[in-house]
Amino acid sequence: MAENDVDNELLDYEEDEVETAAGGDGSEAPAKKDVKGSYVSIHSSGFRDFLLKPELLRAIVDCGFEHPSEVQHECIPQAILGMDVLCQAKSGMGKTAVFVLATLQQLEPVTGQVSVLVMCHTRELAFQISKEYERFSKYMPNVKVAVFFGGLSIKKDEEVLKKNCPHIVVGTPGRILALARNKSLNLKHIKHFILDECDKMLEQLDMRRDVQEIFRMTPHEKQVMMFSATLSKEIRPVCRKFMQDPMEIFVDDETKLTLHGLQQYYVKLKDNEKNRKLFDLLDVLEFNQVVIFVKSVQRCIALAQLLVEQNFPAIAIHRGMPQEERLSRYQQFKDFQRRILVATNLFGRGMDIERVNIAFNYDMPEDSDTYLHRVARAGRFGTKGLAITFVSDENDAKILNDVQDRFEVNISELPDEIDISSYIEQTR
């Protein structure tokens, strides 16, 4: 497959666009030490109870983890035994750490052999997952990790596989398939096959075909794990076809949106009143970092520019910019160089920035799933957060009602004053 074809396919995958960009990620990164609050867990047991390698426990301590989240408590003991796992849990509960820790625990690195394959539907998420592997394998110097996705030269990927073959490969299906077809990537030694945000990949037929073709290139005997924040009853049988008697964990079913500590409000206004209201709110609200979601690339660029003109430290991320630029901006925001991010849905799914405590739906998301993934950017890791949605027409109101009905949550009108302690961790 030509490189351009791969890139175009990936663009099709990544943005189910509605005149816009869409689709952003799905991985849950662990909280770092300087973050206020840690995973809220009903389990008092620590990670030591999982009998993990000492090197992994040291890295976990460095990341500031204390107790496993509910999904980690449920999944890790079985996952490290090599069982197939199908897991749905709400955003911000540490699903990524489940498969990262489980695969690193079982990994016995063999020079020149790829043992672990992790696939996800966007480049940004692939990049983030590879960083999680690097973070947790900090004290495992023999473990090599590589990430492959479209938008960057396939020749460089081929070089890496030839000269410095990784044990763990993370990537998007289009690029992984291209590398496997041209024999650069050998999948005959895969022992662990993981799909993150699996519903996004398996619902789209072209992407599902790629995943199936890649799956057939791997050995019959292997561990398969799939994770997502949203897993409809229709897609679950599709997932099971890849697995042998999987352990199924649905930590919270899709009927409830109980994002711990997240305050949700809406504001009714006309489209031309949005900027003034946004500026007013940014002036009065206390925030660490903010993500503002818009529906198109044009609106993303214009709003970010307007914010900068009003002296707000804003940066934009959208699918219209080159891949290197997107990753560079993502890193700038993650490193706290900018405090306000304007983004299309590309950023909406699972991208983890621990300091974000406010998410704005400047434009209403197109459905309730997208709403869940967007607002989950605030209040991750059991910390507090605030989600504010602008409602400017009947269609917006209908989607907001759908969200409330589906997730059995009451989203009320934004009051004149909000108690700061309800959406930001107070320093002691």
Curated annotation (Swiss-Prot):
Residues 1-32 are annotated as: Disordered. GO terms for molecular function: ATP binding; ATP hydrolysis activity; ATP-dependent protein binding; identical protein binding; mRNA binding; RNA helicase activity; U4 snRNA binding; U6 snRNA binding. The modification N-acetylalanine is found at residue 2. It comes from the Eukaryota. It catalyses: ATP + H2O = ADP + phosphate + H(+). Residues 261-422 form the Helicase C-terminal domain. The modification Phosphoserine is found at residues 38, 41. CDD domains: DEADc_DDX39 (cd17950), SF2_C_DEAD (cd18787). It is found in: Nucleus; Nucleus speckle; Cytoplasm. A motif (DECD box) lies at residues 196-199. There is a cross-link at residue 36 (Glycyl lysine isopeptide (Lys-Gly) (interchain with G-Cter in SUMO2)). The modification N6-acetyllysine is found at residue 36. PROSITE patterns: HELICASE_ATP_BIND_1, HELICASE_CTER, Q_MOTIF. A motif (Q motif) lies at residues 45-73. Residues 76-249 form the Helicase ATP-binding domain. GO terms for biological process: mRNA export from nucleus; mRNA splicing, via spliceosome; spliceosomal complex assembly. The keyword Ribonucleoprotein does not apply. SMART domains: DEXDc, HELICc. It is an enzyme of class 3 (hydrolase). Keywords: Acetylation, ATP-binding, Cytoplasm, Helicase, Hydrolase, Isopeptide bond, mRNA processing, mRNA splicing, mRNA transport, Nucleotide-binding, Nucleus, Phosphoprotein, RNA-binding, Spliceosome, Transport, Ubl conjugation. Belongs to the DEAD box helicase family. DECD subfamily. Involved in nuclear export of spliced and unspliced mRNA. Component of the TREX complex which is thought to couple mRNA transcription, processing and nuclear export, and specifically associates with spliced mRNA and not with unspliced pre-mRNA. The TREX complex is recruited to spliced mRNAs by a transcription-independent mechanism, binds to mRNA upstream of the exon-junction complex (EJC) and is recruited in a splicing- and cap-dependent manner to a region near the 5' end of the mRNA where it functions in mRNA export to the cytoplasm via the TAP/NXF1 pathway. Homodimer, and heterodimer with DDX39A. DDX39B interacts with the THO subcomplex to form the THO-DDX39B complex which multimerizes into a 28-subunit tetrameric assembly. Component of the transcription/export (TREX) complex at least composed of ALYREF/THOC4, DDX39B, SARNP/CIP29, CHTOP and the THO subcomplex; in the complex interacts with THOC2. THOC1-THOC2-THOC3-DDX39B subcomplex is sufficient for the interaction with export factor NXF1-NXT1. TREX seems to have a dynamic structure involving ATP-dependent remodeling. The helicase C-terminal domain mediates interaction with ALYREF/THOC4. This is Spliceosome RNA helicase DDX39B.
